[in-house]
């Protein structure tokens, strides 16, 4: 038996999230099915982050224990021959039995993309939220978000249905940048609550549109005013960029930010 780490990309548009569910197609289900074909035994996969329905991943990290003669670094090629084109394995490698995709991660990185153009763009529609009621003030959004850095109770930014015992987590960094009509919101945290990023984005957009002030934004999450946090950004604009570990287990790829380059270039 050996433990194999997988670096996984997927377009979440037609999946009901990462985790297996009854009567729904998920990324984990499809991946486990492919692993069964290779190993001839049931394989349990563990991911660094459990993305919700419609959310993408450009550098999801997964591990599994397999009893098979296939070398660890060959699983990427073999799996890609079995998986649909919406799921790709960028790299695979054998790791120590003590290494865990979820529990060994120092933090996770999510990115949200807002298309703030007056006009929709068909070619990035599946990976961004077209929101234009006015030009967003990304500087105001960034300033409002800065107070969230650190360990706090983010109860206001947790959707109903979470099984967590508490809503405390630590945000390491938040960055908001505009590239022409596209706004990129990058959030790095030790862990994320259910629906957390999309609820944060929904509120920050209201700040950027001057519909609520930065002070109201802060008051809502600091004082746990969950009933005032009603707007959730669409899933399609959210992407799990990567998970960061004490040691980068993937040897071929040093830079784990695999976000689509064509989006970063914006419109010409």
UniProtKB/Swiss-Prot annotation:
Positions annotated as active site in the UniProt record: 52
CDD domains: PseudoU_synth_EcTruA (cd02570)
Keywords: Isomerase, tRNA processing
Organism: Prochlorococcus marinus (strain MIT 9301)
Superkingdom of the organism of origin: Bacteria
Name of protein: tRNA pseudouridine synthase A
Single GO biological process annotation from the record: tRNA pseudouridine synthesis
Family: Belongs to the tRNA pseudouridine synthase TruA family.
Subunit structure: Homodimer.
A Pfam family reported for this protein in Swiss-Prot or TrEMBL: PseudoU_synth_1
EC number: 5.4.99.12
The UniProt record lists the keyword Secreted: no
One example GO MF annotation: RNA binding
Swiss-Prot/TrEMBL catalytic activity: uridine(38/39/40) in tRNA = pseudouridine(38/39/40) in tRNA
UniProt binding sites for substrate: 110
InterPro entries per record: PsdUridine_synth_cat_dom_sf (IPR020103), PsdUridine_synth_TruA (IPR001406), PsdUridine_synth_TruA_a/b_dom (IPR020097), PsdUridine_synth_TruA_C (IPR020095), TruA/RsuA/RluB/E/F_N (IPR020094)
